[in-house]
């Protein structure tokens, strides 16, 4: 069985067995580090985490948080743990019930007065990769919601720069833009949690930035860098 290292950590950490939301993976697919976990929720965006695809679903009043009528009816459909499929269905419904009431949109006095307000002046509007900023904001909000989240992952792509890595002197700096987005996002996340109204949440939060492979120092013939063997990690 393919079991991720974070999944193994959760199983061996001696942590309380039951919490509402122990793990989440922000992205299109579950992070490899959380493979094998039956507790991890995978979603690209917390505000879009819903059941969709029903007739006229785009006209549903609560479409941003899930189709309430459909969700209610599906509880009866999956109301059994007799099979693995039914158990998975019940777990999905439970996660929808947990997240649907939370307003993950940004605060706006007129259009979204119940939205999320980052603290300490944290700004998740990045120069590039705006989706990364939104995902970091979602995680910060989930941490502040006291749902028991122990681990969360985000997949920030775009680092496989074999061609056209960029050169600031030529006003095209693809790699630099990637690093800028990463830096801005981490700064906003740190500021938001460190200044939380409930106290400095960064004091009990660790952030690890890791790539699946390194890159060579020497530039290749296509203005990029090829795969290397060594790599570094960033820890906050």
Question: For each predicted feature, which ranges?
Answer:
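Feature for exported/extracytoplasmic and membrane-associated proteins, marking the mature portion
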Residues: 1-183, 188-198, 218, 232-236
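Beta-strand elements within well-structured catalytic alpha/beta cores of enzymes
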Residues: 151-156, 206-212
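Histidine-centered active-site microenvironments of extracellular/periplasmic hydrolases
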Residues: 211-236
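Residues at or immediately flanking beta-strands
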Residues: 23, 204-206
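A structural signal for short secondary-structure junctions
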Residues: 146, 199-203, 225-229
């Amino acid at each position: 069985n393919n079991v991720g290292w974070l999944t193994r950590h959760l199983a061996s950490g001696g942590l309380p067995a039951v919490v509402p939301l122990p793990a989440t993976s922000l992205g299109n697919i579950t992070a490899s580090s959380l493979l094998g976990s039956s507790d991890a929720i995978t979603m690209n965006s917390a505000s879009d985490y819903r059941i969709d695809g029903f007739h006229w679903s785009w006209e549903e009043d609560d479409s941003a948080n899930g189709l309430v009528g459909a969700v209610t009816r599906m509880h009866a459909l999956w109301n059994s743990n007799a099979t693995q499929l039914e158990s998975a269905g019940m777990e999905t419904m439970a996660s929808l019930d947990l997240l649907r009431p939370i307003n993950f949109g940004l605060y706006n006095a007129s259009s979204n007065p119940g939205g999320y307000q980052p603290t300490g002046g944290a700004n998740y509007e990045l120069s590039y990769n705006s989706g990364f900023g939104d995902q970091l904001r979602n995680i910060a909000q989930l941490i502040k919601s006291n749902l028991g989240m122990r681990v969360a992952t985000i997949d920030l792509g775009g680092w496989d720069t074999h061609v056209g890595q960029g050169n600031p002197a030529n006003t095209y700096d693809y790699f630099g833009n990637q690093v800028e987005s990463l830096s801005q996002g981490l700064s906003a996340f740190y500021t938001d949690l460190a200044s939380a109204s409930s106290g400095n949440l960064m004091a009990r939060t660790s952030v690890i930035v890791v790539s699946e492979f390194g890159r060579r120092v020497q530039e290749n013939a296509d203005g990029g860098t090829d795969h290397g063997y060594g790599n570094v990690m960033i820890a906050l």
